[in-house]
């Protein structure tokens, strides 16, 4: 069951409904976003919140894509290793059944 949560990002209060078990993670995400916005504002000197949020969103999206690519690469390597192990096991079992 969803429950109302209030979050603050760059001085703006956001009220969202989400399951209580997700409240802590959502607070952490809001804190991360708030920090990124402050860092971007300090680093670039841009004052327009819409522009800052767009840049931060683009950066976070790019980071997410990179992590997804890493995960996919790792999954591919694991699947290759599993296939190799299965092949080795099949060879061993085939050798044992011929004796």
UniProtKB/Swiss-Prot annotation:
GO terms for biological process: division septum assembly; FtsZ-dependent cytokinesis; septin ring assembly. Its main location: cytoplasm. The keyword Acyltransferase does not apply. Belongs to the ZapA family. Type 1 subfamily. Homodimer. Interacts with FtsZ. Activator of cell division through the inhibition of FtsZ GTPase activity, therefore promoting FtsZ assembly into bundles of protofilaments necessary for the formation of the division Z ring. It is recruited early at mid-cell but it is not essential for cell division. This is Cell division protein ZapA. The lineage of its organism: Bacteria, Pseudomonadati, Pseudomonadota, Gammaproteobacteria, Pasteurellales.
